Every structure is written in structure tokens, then in C-alpha cells.
Design a protein with these regions (language model features):
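Catalytic, metal-anchored helix/loop core of enzyme active sites in primary metabolism
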Residues: 113
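Extended, subdomain-level signal for the structured scaffold at the beginning of enzyme domains
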Residues: 1-105, 109, 118-124, 129, ...
Length: 189
């Protein structure tokens, strides 16, 4: 895995309530593969992480604001889950627009657990094959997605996964997909 993403800039979009392991483990996999990761959020400072949505799990430092971010500055996007995190993102027009523009750019986008709620809000799931946490699958189907119950679903530039239990497979898939789709070339700047 080391070096596959050398020079790549990966945006991680998350808000308060992010599931800690769903941000931490994919970020570690991307960093180990040579990517540079930047945490974008709705406010500066730090975001509050959770374990299983209920327990305080510390904080993450925010690197930039999504309202000031440009898709052109990044090679790939990661959308971690947690229930509260995507619920906050999906009502913020700058976050929704950033996700929509990212998917439409053809650059790779990865999302896990409840993270696909933000993809749904961005209007980019119709006709796509995705997986997610079971409780949002009806929402995805109602938005026109084909939903599968698999560790990882890859459809073009979208990579989705179900839950923290699937993190090893998800981390492998995002590194492989980001590298295969050109994120490893580090073209953003």
C-alpha cells in the first residue's frame, strides 16, 4: 500500500458526531499509502467524534472549511459516517454542493455507514449501486439507487461500505480505487 497515492490530496468531509473509527482508520490507510489528507468541516477548530453515536470519542482538528474548498484542489473525497455527522452535512448547502460537484467531476468518492446520506442529498445516487448501514437503505432505494448488502460496493467513481465491521475491506478498496482512478497521480493543485 505504501506509495500508491504519493502526491494525492484527499479531502475528508465530516462534522460533529462523526464516528471516530470511520474517519481515523481510512485516514490512516490513505496516509500510509502516501496521500495527504485534509479534514474539511462546517466550522473551524475541532469536530467532536463519537463511538457508536453515543459515547464521546475525542476530537479531530479541522484543516479547512468546506464553504471555502474547491474540488479542483483535491484528487479524492472521503465521507465517514456516524448518524449525526451526515445529518449535519446534508442540511448545509456548501457541503451538499461540494459533494455533488466532486461526484460529477468523476474523481473518486468513498463513503461508509451513514455517510451515503450526504450522497443522497447531493442527488448523485440514482442509477448507482451502493451499500450502506441497513437503516438508510430504504432512503437510498427511494432515491433511485440499487442497494447491495456487501462489505464494499464500487460503482465507477463511488466506493461505499456498510459499517465499522467492514473497515479493513473498505480501507483496501479506497486505496485501490483512488490509485486506479488517478488520485495517486496527485493532479490536484
Amino acid at each position: 500500500m505504501a506509495g500508491e497515492l504519493k502526491g494525492a490530496r484527499v479531502a475528508i468531509l465530516a462534522a460533529d458526531g462523526v464516528e471516530r473509527v470511520e474517519l481515523e482508520q481510512p485516514r490512516q490507510a490513505l496516509d500510509q499509502a502516501g496521500a495527504s489528507t485534509e479534514l474539511l468541516s462546517l466550522h473551524d477548530g475541532q469536530i467532536q467524534a463519537r463511538n457508536n453515536d453515543l459515547d464521546d470519542a475525542g476530537t479531530f482538528d479541522v484543516d479547512g472549511l468546506v464553504r471555502s474548498a474547491s474540488v479542483a484542489d483535491y484528487d479524492a473525497l472521503l465521507l465517514p459516517g456516524g448518524t449525526v455527522n451526515p445529518d449535519k452535512l446534508r442540511v448545509d448547502q456548501s457541503a451538499v454542493g461540494f459533494v455533488r460537484d466532486f461526484v460529477e467531476s468523476g474523481k473518486p468518492v468513498a463513503s461508509i455507514c451513514h455517510g451515503p446520506w450526504t450522497l443522497l442529498e447531493a442527488g448523485v445516487v440514482s442509477g448507482r449501486t451502493l451499500t450502506s448501514f441497513p437503516s438508510i437503505r430504504t432512503d437510498l432505494r427511494n432515491a433511485g439507487a440499487t442497494v447491495v448488502d456487501e462489505e464494499v460496493a464500487t460503482d465507477g467513481n463511488l466506493v461505499t461500505s456498510r459499517s465499522p465491521d467492514d473497515l479493513p475491506a473498505f480501507c483496501r478498496a479506497i486505496v485501490e480505487t483512488f490509485a486506479r482512478t488517478g488520485a495517486g497521480a496527485g493532479g490536484a493543485r
